[in-house]
Amino acid sequence: MRVPWRWLQEYVKVELPPEELAERLTMAGLEVTAIERFGIPGAPLEWDRERIVVGQILRVERHPNADRLLLATVDYGRGEPKVVVTGAPNLFPFLGRPLERPLKVAFALEGATLYDGHQPGWVKMTLQGRAIRGIYSDAMVCSEKELGISEDHEGIILLDPEAPVGMPLADYMGDVVLDIDLTPNLAHAFSIIGIAREVAALTGRRLRYPSTAVRALGPAVRRLVGIRIEDPQGCPRYSAMVIHGVQVGPSPYWMQWRLRLCGLRPINNIVDITNYVMLEWGQPLHAFDYDLSLIHISEPTRQ
């Protein structure tokens, strides 16, 4: 069970260092086998607080000398915006168009240490200014690979619109992850809230549950969808809810980041939210296409 520190803090305010909390959890029977850091001191790649910050793309223009390259003008909260050369495919939809929402990015300045996105494995490099097809560029909009988040180098990170321009990326999304080896008798702790409950008991801090209020509208679910359970003993209850007006697309980046920290790969907003709730509450969920109209629960395999 991988527990991101920032996520845990939303439910129980922990003032202990991660190592001390790990010791208390281990002595209570929840063995912490590893502590990982991302972007902060002690991480394999520390994100330089002065040189790796949140930026905002103001406009995207075509590179005058290369069809596959773009020029992105980026405000990074310090002085004049910088124009950088990028070939990020997920920026081409914004080419020459007014930006309908703030386009926030992870922005690295000259001298920053990053991973080389064009090299296999994890090879560090120092960002240096140079001319790219006749345009000088001394900064970079970063992919996940360059920041050591994942192997993904197909496009740059698009942060949430609320990300504060100029904030060090380490302050915005740097994190610590506790890797906890849970035994089958601790099923109550197989979730972020389950771990938060244990932490609250061990530290005497108050546990803050997230709101679960849901207002159901329209006809009863049983009039909209059917559920067939073949093995009532193995699965005595199966609950469903119908959600209309859903469009499949990418999840907000804060959710993608939390899923990655927990060891899951983001897929799309539908799959990601079911995985997110499972991690948060320990309740497995599955999303079905409403066109199926019948949810068929077969007999579980005995393994």
Can you annotate each of these PLM segments?
Residues M1-P219:
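Phosphate-backbone binding interfaces of nucleic-acid-interacting proteins
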Residues R2-W7, A187-A201, G263-D289:
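Conserved phosphate/anionic-ligand binding catalytic regions in large, soluble enzymes, centered on
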Residues K13, T26, E61-R62, R260, ...:
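Signal for well-folded cores of large energy- and translation-related assemblies
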Residues W47-R49, M125, W281-L292:
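Glycine-rich loop at the start of a catalytic domain that most often binds anionic cofactors/ligands
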Residues R78-E80, R237-I243, S298:
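Short, basic, glycine/proline-bearing loop/turn elements
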Residues G166-L182, R222-L261:
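Residues forming anionic-ligand binding surfaces in small-molecule and nucleic-acid pockets
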Residues G249-P252, Q256-I270, T274-N275, S298:
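TRNA-recognition modules of translation machinery and tRNA-sensing kinases, especially anticodon-binding
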Residues S293-Q303:
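Residue-level detector of conserved catalytic or cofactor/ligand-binding positions
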